[in-house]
């Protein structure tokens, strides 16, 4: 009996249809396509957004040409050169220095993008130019020598930019993603759509290890790799770089701590596996499942994390430690958020002589997890009896955040959080409150200095068998303990 005989459609066919619908929605026929068809042997398409990145993108492309264990027929790169039509508007609570930096980047990027488009054209046309730097010429020669396919999507020139509301990093990623999925549909393969950033260097075995991860784990619909920041000494001195590196390790570990607490409370009899967090420099998913998650959110910051949340709701996303990338930790205002903006803020704090880095309080995390059930019930009662008001919701949070008679919250931050919370649909909030909103609340409350929080987090995580028995989290614990023990003032 055929699969269609009894009215059942095979899963693969359903996914294909979803992929076609996604492409139709996000890549209208009026959009100019890549002129070269996808190689029938291609299994991975790498999407790279580039907004004013001439200085860095050829570092990435050179590393792409130096990949080991893969043939050039197995992969391609799609570089989405993009910029908005108009200068950015100032965001709510955005520091003046950050906004000014984003405006300056916009002005530089428009010219920079045209230069990048011209240089990238040399890869396919073979034309020589005296305007190339030595590094650019070397990268182009490597790409040609190894037969690497680099395709260009021009969303920077007049009349070609993305619509203003999606002319951002998420919009650029999604534009490249839609074309990559369409190309895989044309060769009838549910290939891999991978993402990285234009300032990132790929480990020589990155693509091979990423592809192998999907082969070993057919149950995985997404894979994220290891991200190791490289030091741009023009941006940060050694001590500030060390602080940012410690902060990155801390964020990864406290996220794992939240996962473990949640697992202990809700799934104590199941095996513990960290759900990998997707990050822009190293995230990937199967093409049709990417479409199932509706692609990359078209937002100016946090598109990678939001994509991961969407993808995780569709299936398993795993961490592959051997798929390593090296982004530059540098000053950058190309996106509305991210590490580049964080560097700008850190340098400003350093000039002012204030507390450099504060972080989420690990002491509060387990307190919150223990109170989630009571909190959800209380909020439901408030909604049913008083309505969804800042006053009613605020009282619940004030109770939650008072521990042993001591308030552990910042009054202004709490009011701001609650006012934003009640603007959302209450039923959706209550449905997701089990963990998501509590974590958001924790991050908005009193934040200790990094050097005070690290010992507390290490003590708590090292006492949890779930984390110590997991290879990924144990490596994080060891790394944070080792790096925090090095000389320096955190």
Can you say where each PLM-predicted feature lies in the sequence?
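Short beta-strand-to-loop element that shapes/binds the nucleotide-sugar donor at the catalytic cleft/hinge
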Residues: 209, 221-242
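Acidic donor-binding loop at a coil-to-helix junction in glycosyltransferase catalytic cores
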Residues: 301-307
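Short, acidic, metal-binding catalytic loop of nucleotide-sugar glycosyltransferases
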Residues: 39, 62-74, 83-86, 112, ...
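Active-site-proximal specificity loops/subdomain of glycosyltransferases
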Residues: 23, 90-190
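Acidic donor-binding/catalytic loop of UDP-sugar-dependent glycosyltransferases
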Residues: 187-190, 196-213
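N-proximal low-complexity "stem/linker" segments adjacent to membrane-targeting elements
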Residues: 1-73, 80, 490
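A recurrent flexible, glycine/aromatic-enriched loop bordering the glycosyltransferase active site
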Residues: 259-284
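Terminal low-complexity segments of carbohydrate-biosynthetic enzymes
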Residues: 1-11, 351-490
């Amino acid at each position: 009996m055929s699969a269609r005989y009894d009215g059942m459609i095979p899963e693969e066919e359903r996914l294909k249809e979803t992929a076609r619908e996604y492409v139709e929605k996000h890549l209208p026929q009026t959009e100019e396509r890549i002129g070269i068809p996808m190689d029938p042997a291609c299994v991975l398409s790498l999407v790279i957004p580039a907004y004013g990145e001439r200085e860095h993108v050829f570092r990435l492309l050179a590393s792409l040409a130096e990949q080991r264990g893969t043939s050039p027929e197995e992969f391609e790169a799609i570089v989405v050169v993009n910029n908005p039509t108009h200068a950015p508007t100032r965001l709510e609570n955005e520091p003046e220095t950050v906004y000014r930096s984003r405006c300056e980047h916009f002005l530089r990027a428009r010219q920079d993008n045209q230069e990048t488009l011209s240089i990238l054209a040399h890869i396919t046309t073979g034309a020589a130019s005296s305007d190339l730097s030595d590094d650019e010429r070397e990268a182009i020669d490597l790409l040609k020598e190894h037969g690497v396919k680099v395709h260009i999507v021009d969303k920077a020139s007049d009349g070609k930019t993305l619509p203003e509301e999606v002319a951002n990093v998420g919009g650029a990623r999604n534009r490249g993603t839609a074309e990559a999925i369409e190309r895989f549909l044309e060769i009838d393969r549910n290939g891999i759509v991978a993402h990285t950033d234009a300032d990132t260097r790929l480990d020589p075995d990155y693509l091979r290890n990423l592809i192998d991860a999907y082969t070993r784990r057919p149950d995985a619909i997404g894979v994220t790799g290891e991200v190791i920041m490289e030091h741009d000494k023009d941006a940060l001195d050694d001590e500030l770089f060390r602080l940012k590196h410690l902060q990155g390790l801390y964020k990864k570990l406290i996220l794992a701590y939240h996962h473990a607490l949640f697992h202990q409370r809700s799934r104590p009899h199941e095996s513990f596996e960290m759900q990998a967090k997707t990050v822009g420099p190293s995230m990937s998913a199967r093409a049709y499942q990417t479409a199932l998650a509706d692609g990359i959110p078209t937002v100016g910051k946090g598109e990678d994390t939001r994509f991961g949340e969407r993808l995780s709701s569709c299936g398993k996303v795993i961490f592959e430690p051997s798929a390593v990338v090296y982004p530059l930790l540098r000053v950058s205002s190309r996106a509305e958020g991210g590490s580049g903006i964080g560097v700008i803020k850190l340098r400003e704090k350093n000039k002012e002589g204030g507390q450099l880095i504060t972080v989420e309080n690990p002491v509060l995390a387990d307190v919150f997890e223990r109170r989630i059930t009571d909190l959800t019930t209380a909020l439901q009662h408030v909604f049913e009896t008083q309505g969804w008001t800042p006053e009613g919701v605020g009282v619940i949070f004030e109770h939650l955040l008072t521990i042993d008679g001591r308030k552990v919250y910042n009054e202004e931050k709490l009011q701001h959080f609650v006012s934003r919370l009640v603007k959302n649909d209450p039923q959706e909030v209550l449905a997701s409150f089990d963990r998501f909103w509590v974590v958001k609340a924790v991050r908005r409350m009193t934040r200790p200095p990094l050097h005070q929080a690290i010992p507390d987090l290490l003590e708590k995580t090292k006492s949890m068998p779930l984390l110590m028995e997991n290879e990924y989290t144990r490596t994080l614990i060891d790394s944070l303990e080792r790096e925090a023990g090095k000389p320096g003032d955190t």
